[in-house]
């Protein structure tokens, strides 16, 4: 006698932590009814290294090399937030030239991060060609980083009160050449991808986040702006010299995976616009506070000693962090990267709390993937742009 199954058995599948579309060591426990997703539970912590506790046992200068391991594809932003924290707490002013250099480096890093989001995202949904295209342009950005900082990744370039070294001779012209080269390439990506019918089938209407949901889930960055909210910390907080340049907040109102793709394409164009303007008006002068002091003291200053300037260049000073608390944030490629820290009249911070955008943005996928197909998980997760280094810390 043949028994007919009256109820469907649900299947639990573990995606990751070694699945190529996880972009790191993320594990998803997915409950399936055939191809339909019933539930999804992210499992985090595989890349936890105790970054917050390490910060509480290091001076800011000692801690700087560690922070580039959070979001290792946009390291300039982790460095920026780490030096901004004590600068804001102790009201340390930075020279104008240093602020412009920082701004240029941040926008180059934003482009590099968005490029390395675009390639794997397209590979996740079946398009291999863009991956090789983006590597071509990304290498040029890394060449610029290497010329200015000595490192292609993990730059360790920002310092309290400025940057480590000034831009080398010819770097500005080289960067301008890249800007004029890269802008048409973004248009090339759009021609190749945006109206492709297979691409549109995979992303249009997939992973929709409404305006209200984006606010309720505390999303930030492209995840927030793709849902119709014009919120960019570069405009809101007025940090560095962004207010002196002409640029627009990129946003979309549909809230789906296609909107998040279009927004990041627009942000790359806007970043090129910011870099061009900054390169044309970048002022001269010192690139860090120590250099300001050296110039102010005159010829008799100890900062003019050969040993101080060349043999063992004096690092940024280690100073006591006053007994108060502060929250600082920057607009990173993934969203709002923030640090809440508490000083205790000590050279070490008493508390160093990291607010990573990826961790917050990763809370919404379980809701987005319900009642979707299994293949849509890769599309939704890819459109969020997560890096597990900053999620797990």
Curated annotation (Swiss-Prot):
GO terms for molecular function: NAD binding; oxidoreductase activity, acting on NAD(P)H, quinone or similar compound as acceptor; quinone binding. GO terms for cellular component: chloroplast thylakoid membrane. It catalyses: a plastoquinone + NADH + (n+1) H(+)(in) = a plastoquinol + NAD(+) + n H(+)(out); a plastoquinone + NADPH + (n+1) H(+)(in) = a plastoquinol + NADP(+) + n H(+)(out). InterPro entries: NADH_Q_OxRdtase_suD (IPR001135), NADH_UbQ_OxRdtase_49kDa_CS (IPR014029), NDH1_su_D/H (IPR022885), NiFe-Hase_large (IPR029014). The keyword Iron does not apply. GO terms for biological process: photosynthesis, light reaction. It is a peripheral membrane protein. Its EC number is 7.1.1.-. NDH shuttles electrons from NAD(P)H:plastoquinone, via FMN and iron-sulfur (Fe-S) centers, to quinones in the photosynthetic chain and possibly in a chloroplast respiratory chain. The immediate electron acceptor for the enzyme in this species is believed to be plastoquinone. Couples the redox reaction to proton translocation, and thus conserves the redox energy in a proton gradient. This is NAD(P)H-quinone oxidoreductase subunit H, chloroplastic. It comes from Cryptomeria japonica. The lineage of its organism: Eukaryota, Viridiplantae, Streptophyta, Embryophyta, Tracheophyta. The gene is ndhH.
